[in-house]
Amino acid sequence: MTGPARPFPRHSPGSVGGGPAGPLRTRGGPPARSISKADHPFIGSTGVRPRAESRPMPNASFSTPERIAEELARLNYLAAPGLAAAVFLAMKLRLPLFLEGDPGVGKTVLARKIGEMLGVAPIRLQCHSGIDRSQALYEWDFTRQLLHLRGTPDGESIYRREFLIARPILRAVEERPSVLLIDEIDRADDEFEAFLLEVLEGDTLSIPDYQTITIDEPPFVVLTSNGTREVHGALKRRCVYHWVDHPTEQDEAEIIRRNVPEVAGTPLAAQIATAMTRLRQLSLVRPPGVAESIAFARAAAALGRHTVAEAADDALGVLVKQREDQEAVRDVLRAGAP
């Protein structure tokens, strides 16, 4: 996925979070405020570079990449050494973590596990074609504003927190601590990438007619991409980048055992891992990921099948999502263990 660099589109004048305030415009909101987050075990930043005032990580569990890997393993997520190091560096250097890889390799799951490590549920921003800043940052509740205007004296501000609908980025800034998952950024367009770049570089969020929020302790940000298109290099440069590959056959078998205890004492997990390795070597429309391996193991266990060959026909639907792939996948599964 290489190609010539492309410039970001220019934004209209205004700060991050700007945008049309809508038809109801009343000046005179409260003064700017600062959100100052108290000390907590959360480490992370959306800054473009490590902040000078960064504190050492207070939780000994996160003190080395090896300890990160151990903590993730405790949560049934097996992280390769390079991936554990990327998580550690993103925390230590207070930078966003950019995870890229094929669908189903565990990128989104890792963000959830990081949230578990930090004791929070990740706030997810699901990207899609046409997503804009209002869906990511905030919107005004125009209906409530209009109703309020009808029953209040002239001149009273309708740009107050009670009328502000916080979207994922603003919610992540306001919650303490927080993990912000920006999922499948490759599905968004250049303009939204440019908006995110402004957010990742800034220490404030400006909400016109309301106030400017100073971000003293930003959320830990995880961005994921399936590689369907090239994400702009300027955005990646603000992050710790890691390509998440498929696990080794041995690791995949262990992942299956950890997530599907019903097959832990049988040869089925190893057989499935071997079959998945073979399938990924074929020219399939949609090669199976780890998520499909786990789903197939659960289906086989539910059906009472003890080998891959026995489950080949009945459990095929949880593994294959493209009609063109069915015959090739069925042949590999029916062949069973070597």
Predicted regions and their residues:
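Hydrophobic alpha-helical context, especially transmembrane and signal-peptide helices
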Residues: 5-10, 20, 35, 67, ...
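Intrinsic-disorder-associated, low-complexity terminal segments enriched in Asp/Asn/His/Tyr and depleted
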Residues: 11, 39-40
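C-terminal regulatory/interaction module of P-loop NTP-utilizing enzymes
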Residues: 40, 50-338
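Short, positively charged and aromatic/hydrophobic N-terminal segments
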Residues: 24, 35-36, 43-56
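Compositionally biased, low-complexity flexible segments
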Residues: 1-33, 49
